[in-house]
UniProtKB/Swiss-Prot annotation:
ATP binds at residues 190-197. This is DEAD-box ATP-dependent RNA helicase 52. It is an enzyme of class 3 (hydrolase). Keywords: Acetylation, ATP-binding, Helicase, Hydrolase, Nucleotide-binding, RNA-binding. Residues 388-539 form the Helicase C-terminal domain. SUPFAM superfamilies: P-loop containing nucleoside triphosphate hydrolases. Residues 1-64, 76-117 are annotated as: Disordered. The modification N-acetylserine is found at residue 2. The keyword Nucleus does not apply.
Amino acid sequence: MSSNSWADVSESERAPSGGGWGYSRPSRTNYVPPHLRSRTPSSEFVAPSPGNNDRGGYGGANSGYGGRGQGYGGRGSGYGGRGGPVGGWNARSGGWDRRDTETNPFGNDGNADPAVNEQENTVINFEAYEDIPIETSGDNVPPPVNTFAEIDLGEALNLNIQRCKYVKPTPVQRNAIPILAAGRDLMACAQTGSGKTAAFCFPIISGIMKDQHIERPRGVRGVYPLAVILSPTRELACQIHDEARKFSYQTGVKVVVAYGGTPVNQQIRELERGVDILVATPGRLNDLLERGRVSLQMVRFLALDEADRMLDMGFEPQIRKIVQQMDMPPPGVRQTMLFSATFPREIQRLASDFLSNYIFLAVGRVGSSTDLIVQRVEFVHDSDKRSHLMDLLHAQRENGNQGKQALTLVFVETKKGADSLENWLCINGFPATTIHGDRSQQEREVALRSFKTGRTPILVATDVAARGLDIPHVAHVVNFDLPNDIDDYVHRIGRTGRAGNSGLATAFFNDNNTTMAKPLAELMQEANQEVPDWLTRYASRASFGGGKNRRSGGRFGGRDFRRESFSRGGGGADYYGGGGGYGGVPGGGYGAMPGGYGPVPGGGYGNVPGGGYAPYGRGGGAYYGPGGYGTVPNQGYGPGVASAWD
């Protein structure tokens, strides 16, 4: 899939829509943040198509995520919020009182152990995880755990874990939670649907709970979150927020979400009620920062979900502004965690700017060595794609439960193509809906809800839905238009076969997709899938390195680029400079002179000889001194790390 849909997402996020929030105000010129004033407007809105779909009215009675009535605690708090008493971590005597009136995210049954909505709670097939390979690299990696009880997460959080019906940790949770609980920075590469959200939410919530007496500035206009979680899309931000609210229930930790496409004043009012964890999209967070409504100076935890997409598809300037140019504490002072299903080497190099002495964790893909996701590739000319899709849907309906259509996700390249295909499907008796960048936030939320409930069991989507969204029970993913990048293909088919359950992925291939032939054939071979002979012939004709095949790491979505960098050493194997290492001088590191990452010979990561990570001298030669990343000078990557494989 081309990058158009992600640009569309960004543009759509910048154009707030006021409908459905029960909020109106006198007409006036909209505030446009300075960093967006030079942008060109988004493409014209595509008129909604008729048919049997979700595009009726929107019951906009809700006041947004977080809901009313979630008062932030007793009087006398330091937030000075408008419209009533607030509380929080500034005033411990009042902040915890909000637990008495906190909305129950598990339901309204009032039981000590409320049940999670069964439709949303996908049953995890833990047996499928038993043989998944795991790789860790870095200094002094904490050992994995086998149960949540092995880590002191706190009584209230442990109770919520039980309420969520989490029996035991998934592989990414077994390894990531102890790493983060130890205060280490982390870059984690794990398949979507493998439990990444809980893997970073649990340590964040636990860390805030354990430091209950932190004082934040009083009587100021802005708010001071202790944790920031960034995601590339509104849907993923809302999903993370909903999950984090479940995990933080009755802990005293307040979670708020902020994203574009909705009135900013509604979200400002929610922030003024208090916030400990802020889940946000980069564009809306930059807007709030420029308005002076949010300060990052108290941030102790920074998490980036789908980090590779944010850094690779145009969000990098916004991320760098948030992390490096505002008042956020530097790496080493704050704890940073990056998660995604894929981490190509070039994205790792960008991401490493935000981390300090980090650990790299790679969890093998579920389905790479099993048949959990059955992948099929069929040669279909563009003119025949619709009729071929119709044949698939008819066969799927006949084989379905009591004639019901199984949930099917169809990926297309353009927004207009999505609307056109949706209209055609509805006309031909297949209820469908769409999600793409030109639909308002309300329409996108309604479309997702309609799809999840089975009212419209076919969702036609651009790549806006490909990243991170947890849509349970998707039986079939159809790549109507193949993407141009194999990593995007991996994220797309990851919408099915989630949580260790089985699924089907079908791709339509033709002469327009020849650059994908080689990486697609390699991926299918890796996953023990049957590769058609005609695809093998296309792959053999493909030139070496053709297309945008950025994958590395075999069964993993990526491997630690530092291993390759430091193991190659020199002799023309460098990346930036000739004759060794990453520098432009023989034997050099990342810097301009011999011996390390810094600009001084023998320099480690900092700018002091034998130095550390940045000007703080962190490491002092023990970690980043002469010779590489090892714990002993001149020893390369250092001693072997104990295996974390199951």
